[in-house]
Amino acid sequence: MDLFIVLVICLSCLLLVSLLKQSYARRKLPPGPTAFPLVGNVLQLDRKNISKSISMLAKEYGPVFTVYFGTKPSVVLHGYEAVKEALVDHGEEFSGRVTVPVFDRYAQGAGLFASQGELWKETRRFTLTVLRNMGMGKKTIEDRIQEEASCLVKALKETNASPCDPSSLLFCVPCNVICSIIFQNRFEYNDQTFQTLVKHFLDSIRLFNTPWMQLYNTFPILHYLPGSHHELFKVFNDQMKFFSEKIREHQESLDHNNPRDFIDYLLIKMEKEKHNKQSQFTMHHLLVTIWDVFDAGSQTTSSTMQFGLLLLMKHPEIAAKVQEEIERVIGRDRSPCMQDRSCMPYTDAVIHEIQRYIDMVPNNVPHAVTQDIQFRGYLIPKGTHILPSLTSVLYDEKEFPNPEKFDPGHFLDASGNFKKSDYFLPFSIGKRACAGEGLARMELFLVLTTILQHFTLKPLVDPKDIDPTPVDNGFLSVPPSYELCFVPV
């Protein structure tokens, strides 16, 4: 009985502390829905479609408001003006990164995703420099993507127009492009090592986008309980072992005067800084950076392609117009190239509309403020989590009339020319914008046009019965599983 009383008193104290902390914080933070002790607003949000819940809250509280995930407040930025004002006009102050417990367990503040301050700035600057040296934005990387697109066509022809799930093959394309940058070589799709690498990344995507992992990131204490996070950490460990072996191979054959790939550049950077006790370019940092480049360079691009094929099957009239433009501009005798894009406004508009419509990262990768800041009349304390709602920008009704409709006309003017939009932010904006945006744009254009140059997409059901709704709309929009037939043209 005495123990029970002690437990009740302890729980009551925890609730009281939680209430007092929330009450004090709310005096300065933007308004928002009333949060419950300990769990915050978690029970008031639709886990499968957080962006929809946020849109409803924005109608009540305005473009800047506060929600609590557990006991931690997150300031939501809703609409283009609020997002731009924070991430661009106050870019430095909003350039921090939230600690995501599941990532922090293995990253420990290292890499491109989880690092902060000067380490992040130096890592991002170094990564972009190396990627440019490796040919990003140049003909050399375009050649690699074209080669990979040709290999994909060969693999798709081997399906003999039979029903197939395209997810694994579509993941192989950007993954192999990244392999050529990181390791200097690509893999055959049936290579067992490559198959294992692809499986690990697909498993990590599947596991991370589960309800349990969202709960884990809100309540890290769950780490000590059974759950799928243990399986995810095993996948991470297997990936790190693979990368460690690749690094060891590179160390044995490293030529400081002739770097071959991303790993060589990182090893040379480490060697130059080995006498600098302040340097954070450690082996662990190298490993996590490689993982981050792989993940960012493969996951969202392949998922966008999966969504793209699904949407083109649902709208065969749009796919037919793209194929007409491909036939007129490129023909059948050569591979698509980036120079073609300026002559293919409809295809360009379709690819932009795919990215807008699928809303790949609805609430962006969470930011944090790097210092106390006055923003729109509110004091946001240093370290506060920031959720920029990209959904609210990509689905802005004034910029994109009928945003719920898949319509390439959103990116075409009255004359049928391609029309840019400042609201097109699938890669985010500001200092933490996706470092691989240029690479992703090239891959999407070259791979999708190459597929449609060689195949007609045949669904297994009536197009009107195709449902492109994501199976999960939490951190990432995950495409539903489906099969189709790639019929040679």
UniProtKB/Swiss-Prot annotation:
Enzyme class per UniProt: oxidoreductase
Protein localization: Endoplasmic reticulum membrane; Microsome membrane
Record carries keyword Plastid: no
Any GO MF annotation of the entry: iron ion binding
Topological relation to the membrane, as annotated: Peripheral membrane protein
The family this protein is said to belong to: Belongs to the cytochrome P450 family.
GO cellular component: endoplasmic reticulum membrane
CDD domains found in the cross-reference section: CYP2C-like (cd20665)
EC number: 1.14.14.1
Membrane-spanning segments: none
Annotated binding of heme, by residue: C434
Catalytic activity reported: an organic molecule + reduced [NADPH--hemoprotein reductase] + O2 = an alcohol + oxidized [NADPH--hemoprotein reductase] + H2O + H(+)
Record's function text: Cytochromes P450 are a group of heme-thiolate monooxygenases. In liver microsomes, this enzyme is involved in an NADPH-dependent electron transport pathway. It oxidizes a variety of structurally unrelated compounds, including steroids, fatty acids, and xenobiotics.
UniProt cross-references to InterPro entries, sorted A to Z: Cyt_P450, Cyt_P450_CS, Cyt_P450_E_grp-I, Cyt_P450_E_grp-I_CYP2A-like, Cyt_P450_sf, Cytochrome_P450_fam2
Organism encoding this protein: Oryctolagus cuniculus
Induction: P450 can be induced to high levels in liver and other tissues by various foreign compounds, including drugs, pesticides, and carcinogens.
Example GO BP: organic acid metabolic process
Protein name: Cytochrome P450 2C30
Cofactor(s) the protein requires to work: heme
Keywords on record: Endoplasmic reticulum, Heme, Iron, Membrane, Metal-binding, Microsome, Monooxygenase, Oxidoreductase
Top-level division of the source organism's lineage: Eukaryota
Gene name of the record: CYP2C30
Record lineage: Eukaryota, Metazoa, Chordata, Craniata, Vertebrata
Pfam families for this protein: p450 (PF00067)
